[in-house]
Amino acid sequence: GVMRGREFLMKDSYSFNADEACLEETYQTMRNTYKTVLERIGLDYKIVSADSGSIGGDASEEFHVLADTGEDTIAISDSSEFAINTELLLKDGEDISSLEGKPSPDGNGIIQIKKGIEVGHIFQLGKVYAEDMKANVLNNEGKATTLHMGCYGIGVSRLVAAAIEQNNDDKGIVWPHGIAPFDINIIAIGYEKDQKISEAADSLHAELISMGYEVILDDRKDGYGTKMKDSELIGIPLNIIIGKQFIENNEIELKARTGESSSNDIGDTKTILDFFKNK
């Protein structure tokens, strides 16, 4: 599926700093940048203390999107930001299940075991590679000093897969607003037969697009059931249904992908958008 495609996109970057303090500052900047990315998308995630592995270095952290289908097992506190790869917490011979319910090592709350999908990894490499490459720079005193390196990677296409794994139901995808392919789907029932419906759908479509929203107009000849199932499968956050109710009393139905619904006057765009933003 999407998680293990033959092609993937990665964002990799490196930093080269004059000293350890400068590396720490850059590291925190990148850490906060990755946090911003995940928060803007709308994902539930944890920053996990990790083993640097074969890459080496002084410190590393992984960014995990929480999902029951995740390949990694992580231990988190129920009362703080503490999170760590279980392999770093387990003692020889211990089973993962033995960690559940134990006091958190940071003294706050108890340990819970969760599954996560790793979408990012950041490292403080220090001088490990710079020394081998003889990567030196003159400091303020004019003396040669070895650079301190940092390494930062985030899986761009893996973020999409993780978002799907975390946000879905038996009908299909439930996209977070931040990365949904469309914000709104206008389902026009009888578009090709009723001029009142087609004109209203076209007008609302144009208005919402002019306001900066990504909007699709489903003007196919298919019935309501087919159109709604397709929209739920794709995961568009809001459906606006223009059909029989509109012909009878000028009302449209608003239906969020998360299940909430409401009837609304077609001319009250503010209420429509408030409904969208709150779902």
Model-derived segments and their meaning:
Residues 1-279:
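NTP/phosphate- and nucleic-acid-binding module
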